[in-house]
Amino acid sequence: MKKIIAKYVLLIVVTFAASIFIYEYIMANKPIDTETDLLYAQTQSERQYLSNTNYTIDNPNVILNPYGNSPLSALIVFQTKDLTTSTVTIKGKDGAEDLTHTFTPTKVHILPIYGLYAGYDNKVVIEASGIRKEITITTSPLPDDFSKVTDLSNADYETDEFYFTTPEEIGYTAAYDSEGEVRWYLIGDYKWDIQRLNNGHILLSSDKILSKNYSVGLIEMDLLGKVYYEYAVPGGYHHDVYELNNGNLLLASNKYGRSTVEDVAVEIDRATGNIVKEIDLYNILPGDKKGNWFGINSINYDINTNSITISGYNGNMIVNLDYPTLDINWVIADKDKVDDDYSQYLLKADGDIDYPNNPESINLISGNKMMLASEIDGKKHLLTYQIDYSNRTVKQLDDYELPSDEETYLEIIGEDDYVITQGHTIIEIQNNKKIISMNVNSTLYNTKKMSLYANDVYTGVQGVRLGSLGESVTTKNYLLISAKSDDSILDEYKISLYKDVFGLKVSGTFKKSDDVQIVLDNVLDKKTYILQEPQDSNGKVTVSRYISEDGIKGKYYIYLRINGKIYKLHKYVNF
């Protein structure tokens, strides 16, 4: 009898324990939100509006903002009986110059339309096969938080090119004409550099933030907002990228798992997304290194010398490396600001010279000349250097003082023509004269002067995702038996959790002194990731990171560990 009672008691205990387990691991947990795959969504959109192209020039199909992220762009679709060119003209507003573009001959015309005005009935003229058709495309006003031009001085300067800008922190990637009108913008969190590739597409940072200051990688798109390639990079991307002559991309990155940051660049194969070369300044340059000791913020490649030139904001130096071997060719730096180990690489000054001090935005002008932004007595200056390779000397040719001490980014258009971005201000200078100055009501990162149209032939090819974030680095695990249930934790720390194609994105706001980890558990496996390491400072900070898809598979329950206490978030994620 006692054995029977014992069995029943054991059964009750097991059932009770199983019930608790089922509740804790199944009933009490909800899935986190999953974001729709961008490339899948754009393919579905294309299938819908390209399924029928049987329209005429007299009654074309007009699709405003076809990909949902470029509100001042459109597609016009129609067919002609014969192979013929087509020309579109976007009529200028209030007497401004018209924008005209002629497309290559075809019978099925799928025409990208760029340069529409916001909140306006845009008049667009289409001409093909001797027929002229005027249509109206009505656009929505700019968002309330848009970076608008607040002050413009252009000395009646007219140009058919546009000023493409990226935001420093918050804002929109956009293009302004010389009248200060917004003629194109993207919806999405695109930061760092913007540039036009040789194929006419633009290259931007991914709008996915890997962690503070680093995006997941790069996106190649057209001005319609169609993504052709999305590149994931294990160390993420920051500041600058350069298109090499072979088409590959050389970009500033990072190396996770060590204490130093922003001292690595990588070359990624354009066709595969694989890293084919790593430039690790930590191992290349001499001297002591800790934290953000170098601070890569610009990279240039010189085909004539097969070398790369890199600026180090915190290192106060310009470094040139032989690209095949990564041997140090030369360094421009004040010998009193660098370790003695650099002495054999330093170029000697030919005359008086202002050495790089928090240098930014190196641009190679021609041959042995370069221009960069540097700080002198608290002010930003544009310096022009000339290098004598034979004698290993550097000469300062010019010094142009800038109007403010804000971060400065520079684009060389020609030897005597360049665009400067400083804080809220865009300035173009030709022959040492300011020809346009434009202020906006938000802080900008960089500006490139480019045309809207460049080799624009619309194709319905499917976008491709390449590369990988690699496996996320884990730390030591902790017992979860003491985990607390506290639903207020999500709100208290503003915890955000969602899943996308790259992995689990986690963000939250903590005290800088907080020690924070994310714990993933699926009973059979447990993984712990650092979200924030404690800092010896006051205040709060918002942090975010990705836990990569690579190296993890299955259903995991999510816990948050803060200063030694573990909390159940009652959420799970499927990898």
PLM feature spans:
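Long, highly charged alpha-helical interaction/scaffolding segments
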Residues: 528, 536-575
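Solvent-exposed serine/threonine-rich low-complexity stretches and specific carbohydrate-binding patches
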Residues: 96-106, 525-543
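Surface-exposed, short loops/turns at beta-strand junctions within beta-sandwich domains
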Residues: 113-121, 547-554
